[in-house]
Amino acid sequence: MKALTSNVSKALPIGATLQCVDNTGAREIQIISVKGFKGVRRRLDVAGVGDLVVASVKKGTADMRREVVNAVVIRQKKEYMRADGLRVKFEDNAAVIITPEGILKGSEVRGPVAKEAADRWPSVGSAASILV
C-alpha cells in the first residue's frame, strides 16, 4: 500500500452504503469501520477513494450476505482535487472486496477506477478496465 498523491476529500462515514462492483457475489456493502483512521473523540470514521474499509455485505448472493469483509473504495460522488488542480467526481460510491493480504478477491472490476486507488492497490489497478 502506497501513500496517496492527492488530498482526497473523505466523504463516506460509518454506515454509508457502497456498490460492490466486482464479481464476488456481493452487490451492496455498508461501512463498519475505516482501517488506519485517526480522529478525535466521538468523531465518526470517514473514508475516501483508496481507503481500506471493513464492511458488511447487505445485498448479494445468499452465501455472501451478512459477511464481514475488507474492501477498497474506488469511486466516490464527492469531488476531490488532484495535485495538478483537476477536480474528480464519479456518479456513484463504489468499492471492491479484497483479501486481508491486499489481493483482489474477484477477477474483474466493473466501471471506472480512480487513479489514486489503482496506484495504492496494484491488484485493483491491474483488474480495472478503465482508469480515471
From Swiss-Prot:
One of its GO terms (biological process) is translation. It comes from the Archaea. Keywords: Ribonucleoprotein, Ribosomal protein, RNA-binding, rRNA-binding. It holds the Pfam family Ribosomal_L14. One of its GO terms (cellular component) is cytosolic large ribosomal subunit. The keyword Ribosomal protein applies. GO terms for molecular function: large ribosomal subunit rRNA binding; structural constituent of ribosome. The keyword RNA-binding applies. Belongs to the universal ribosomal protein uL14 family. Binds to 23S rRNA. Forms part of two intersubunit bridges in the 70S ribosome. Part of the 50S ribosomal subunit. Forms a cluster with proteins L3 and L24e, part of which may contact the 16S rRNA in 2 intersubunit bridges. NCBIfam families: PRK08571.1, uL14_arch. This is Large ribosomal subunit protein uL14. It comes from Methanobrevibacter smithii (strain ATCC 35061 / DSM 861 / OCM 144 / PS). The lineage of its organism: Archaea, Methanobacteriati, Methanobacteriota, Methanomada group, Methanobacteria. The gene is rpl14.
